[in-house]
From Swiss-Prot:
PROSITE patterns: HYPA (PS01249). This is Hydrogenase maturation factor HypA. Zn(2+) binds at C70, C73, C86, C88. Belongs to the HypA/HybF family. Transmembrane segments: none annotated. Ni(2+) binds at H2.
Length: 113
């Protein structure tokens, strides 16, 4: 389960960014072609965030669908797997979306001094 290591890195990156401030919400974008299971990341997040400034934060995960462009005819096609075939018969596709893993938003508590 590589999601544990990925989630540990996400917690470390967000903790560094928050600089000790309490994190309320995180929005991740995970591509459907990335081989990362959103449910596993959610499960690991609850464990990895314990005792950190992220504990209790809401983790929102937005899944990004797979999309590719055919090198032969230029058509864009939806992908459910990291490979596919275009309507023109070509298998030469460039993936446009679906492989990403991004920390898109981080919401931290404001500290008034």
């Amino acid at each position: 389960m590589h999601e544990l290591g990925i989630t540990q890195n996400i917690v470390a990156i967000v903790s560094e960014y928050a600089q000790g401030s309490k994190v309320n919400r995180i929005l991740l974008e995970i591509g459907k072609l990335s081989a990362i299971m959103p449910d596993a990341v959610q499960f690991c997040f609850d464990i990895c965030s314990k005792g950190t400034s992220l504990e209790g934060a809401v983790l929102e995960i937005r899944e990004i669908p797979g999309l590719a462009k055919c090198r032969q005819c230029g058509a864009e096609i939806a992908l459910e797997k990291p490979f596919g075939i275009c309507g023109c018969g070509s298998v030469h596709l460039d993936v446009i979306t679906g492989e990403e893993l991004k920390i898109k938003e981080i919401e931290v508590e404001e500290v008034c001094v």
